[in-house]
């Protein structure tokens, strides 16, 4: 009898803990990227793949591109420069998100495409940065997958959700 009671209590506490862990919400934008660097198509493709990876595979609550673009337009933010802390706060408030994933692309050595995702919280503070390089547009899927996985870990830490450590062999 006591055993059944303890199991019921454990299940109740587990359910409460899961309910209390509100997931992180975020948005992806390339507002800070230089619009004249010739990578528009690649950037657009990467953003959609990256957004899909975060939403589908990493289970992060992400806003759709149209909502983000409307908020950027409403706030009259100009492209190609780093957002200020105040602008980030205002954008997060308008979008009702915990964080932003700000994507930048550039050409690196041997014409590689270097992607940097800067993650900022809704207070405007940078909480992490993930960088990767791809040889061409054909690497978009694999690169977006690995970057989304790394960014999801950083995004979850904003809410205090830390991934479990792997068991020792």
Label each region the model flagged.
Residues 31-34, 60, 65-68, 105-108, ...:
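Solvent-exposed coil/turn segments that connect beta secondary-structure elements
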Residues 57-102, 108-111:
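Short, solvent-exposed, polar/charged sequence segments at loop or secondary-structure edges
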Residues 13-20:
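Sec/Tat signal peptide C-region and signal peptidase I cleavage site
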Residues 1-5:
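Positively charged n-region of N-terminal signal peptides that target proteins for export
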Residues 115:
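Beta-strand acidic-aromatic groove motif in beta-rich domains, primarily in extracellular
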Residues 21-27, 46-47, 53, 57, ...:
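C-terminal/domain-edge helix-coil "capping" segments
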Residues 37-46:
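Glycine- and acidic-residue-enriched helix-capping/strand-helix junction motifs
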Residues 25-37, 72-73:
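Acidic/histidine-rich, surface-exposed loop or edge segments in extracytoplasmic proteins
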């Amino acid at each position: 009898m006591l055993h059944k009671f303890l199991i019921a209590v454990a299940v109740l506490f587990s359910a409460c803990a899961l309910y209390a862990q509100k997931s992180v919400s975020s948005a992806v934008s390339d507002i800070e990227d230089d619009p004249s660097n010739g990578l528009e198509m690649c950037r657009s493709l990467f953003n959609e793949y990256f957004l899909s990876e975060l939403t589908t595979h990493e289970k992060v609550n992400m806003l759709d591109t149209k909502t983000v673009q409307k908020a950027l337009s409403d706030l009259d933010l100009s492209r190609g420069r780093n957002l200020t802390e105040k602008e980030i706060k205002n954008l997060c408030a308008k979008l009702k998100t915990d964080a932003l994933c700000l994507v930048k692309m550039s050409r690196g050595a041997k014409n590689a495409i270097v992607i940097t995702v800067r993650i900022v919280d809704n207070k405007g503070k940078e909480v992490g940065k993930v960088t990767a390089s791809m040889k061409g547009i054909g690497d978009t899927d694999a690169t977006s997958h690995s970057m989304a996985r790394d960014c999801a870990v950083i995004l979850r830490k904003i809410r205090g959700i830390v991934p479990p450590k792997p068991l020792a062999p």
